[in-house]
Amino acid sequence: MSAFEPNPLVPDRFKGTCRYAVSWAFAGFCRARCFYCFAGGQNLQQPLARAWTDEDAMHTWGRLRSQNGPMWVGCSGIFEPTEELGVLVALSVAGHYGYIQTNLMAEPGELADAVDPGRFDLHPTFHPHVWRGEAPAFLHRLNRLRDEGFTIPFVAMVAHPVYFRWLEQWVDEFVDAGYATNVQPMRSMQWAGKDYPADYNDAERVVLRGLMPGGDPVYTDNIEPVPLRIASCSAGHNYCCISRSGDVMRCAQVPNTEPNNIFNDNAIDWDAEPLPCGEEFCRCNHLYALHTTEVDAGDHADAVDA
């Protein structure tokens, strides 16, 4: 394979293997039943319908590998990817790499059988509702998956007001067990008559800033959205989003008006160069990894129009 520019979203150990990164929100079910689920997952009685099969996924992702080489596939979204192990098998067999966002409710042995732990990292999220607020039970399963060979870069948590008083304790427990943590504020949610993240009080903001990962402006500055100071973005150039139905979008915040669909035998139409972004705010988890040119806030409109 010819050399290509390293993708900032791909872990260092795979930068020479995966030119492109994609996020695929294929999951359509979750058993966690968290009362605070913003997507209504607590009310799901069965998986959401889909028009494609696991076999379709196997064929499609095999074709995408032949067109793009092995890709870094983020198995994420609002529901639980491990509820559809057949899709994870398809991605692994097709020869891709990536990560799986998970609540760890799947049996560790089943997950290790579905995907190659050497190809897929785990991005687990600790949901206190599922584990009755007990980090040790979650850690037991986490350690089993680590023993299976999975790389676990961090354990994520959301700073829900109901659980805020225990956040520092849980972070300490995970760090003591050898895991980095990624605490994120609630975003665009209401609880007990308050709007979050705007209504975190000053004391909570001090705690949050102490727990959130440092060194990246999306984490240290973006408790609330901040105006973009970006001239161009690599979304659509070396990264894209794919919906559950298979529609290909430049990014989840600004969908394409006429997206391709991977299940219609369409190729992903990568942009030749990073493109300007006309949004006032960016809510992408990859902020500042995808954005390639930073400009002064006052120059943003000119940069977009250029």
What role is predicted for each listed range?
Residues 61-64, 85-92:
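N-terminal active-site wall of soluble small-molecule enzyme domains
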Residues 132-222:
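Conserved C-terminal portion of the radical SAM core fold
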Residues 1-23, 285-306:
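N-terminal [4Fe-4S]-dependent radical SAM core
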Residues 3-56:
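Canonical Radical SAM [4Fe-4S] cluster-binding loop centered on the CxxxCxxC motif
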Residues 82-86, 106-110, 164-167, 249:
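Short, well-ordered alpha-helical microsegments
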Residues 192-306:
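Accessory C-terminal segments flanking Radical SAM cores
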Residues 57, 84-88, 135-138, 167:
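Aromatic/hydrophobic pocket-lining residues that form the small-molecule binding cavity
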